């Protein structure tokens, strides 16, 4: 079984799953735990006028974090370093965000010691390069594929979108629900009628 006992653990991802990895690593007796997040450090308190009715953007410290971990933001992981098939470190660089994309900060490269790297990365939006660019679908203000919630149709004929691609990062139950509804919409678009459940 996989254990963090006595290891230098790096958790890549700053969300709830990352927090769970931090807590589990501490309880298993990790030598050190470092949590990295690609996004900038959120403010200590949310701007209530700017966030309602959306989930507020603010720094969250869970009980897992209180157990102990180094936390670092605006960090891009570049390369896993290893020796004889074992992980020994993680090469990283600091980044600056302009609101939609980031640039590496020249001269900010650093390497962290690591025996165990846990991937707990979230979703920052659909990748545009490739299929989305070629399809020419419209994007919403958040950078997700714009599609209605009845037929899941985009502005391009015969192209549909649902789940995280359409609504952004969310719970898997939403992706499942929208996937089923979108399948029904596609079936109806192709066949003219559908007997798939909604």
Predicted features along the sequence, with ranges:
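FAD-site-proximal beta/loop scaffold in flavoenzymes
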Residues: 1-6, 98-169
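Redox-cofactor binding/interface segments in oxidoreductases and associated redox assembly factors
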Residues: 11, 92, 119
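Cofactor-binding loop segments of dinucleotide-utilizing enzymes, especially the Rossmann-like FAD-
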Residues: 14, 37-41, 164
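Flexible loop/turn segments at secondary-structure boundaries
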Residues: 17-21, 41-45, 79-81, 97-99, ...
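Rossmann-like dinucleotide-binding cores of NAD(P)H-dependent redox enzymes
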Residues: 22-79, 193-198
């Amino acid at each position: 079984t996989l254990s963090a006992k006595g290891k230098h653990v790096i958790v890549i991802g700053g969300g709830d799953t990352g927090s769970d990895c931090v807590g589990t690593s501490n309880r298993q007796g990790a030598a050190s735990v470092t949590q990295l997040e690609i996004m900038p450090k959120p403010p200590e308190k949310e701007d209530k006028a700017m966030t309602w009715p959306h989930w507020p953007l603010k720094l969250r410290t869970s009980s897992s974090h209180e157990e102990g971990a180094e936390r670092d933001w605006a960090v891009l992981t570049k390369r896993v370093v290893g020796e004889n098939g074992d992980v020994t470190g993680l090469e990283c660089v600091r980044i600056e965000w302009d609101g939609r994309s980031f640039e590496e900060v020249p001269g900010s490269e650093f390497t962290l010691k690591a025996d165990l790297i846990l991937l707990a990365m979230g979703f920052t939006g659909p990748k545009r390069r490739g299929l989305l660019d070629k399809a020419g679908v419209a994007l919403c203000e958040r950078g997700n594929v714009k599609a209605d919630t009845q037929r899941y149709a985009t502005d391009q004929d015969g192209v549909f979108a649902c789940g995280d691609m359409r609504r952004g990062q969310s719970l898997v139950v939403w992706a499942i629900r929208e996937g089923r509804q979108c399948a029904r919409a596609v079936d109806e678009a192709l066949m003219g009628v559908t007997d798939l459940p909604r």
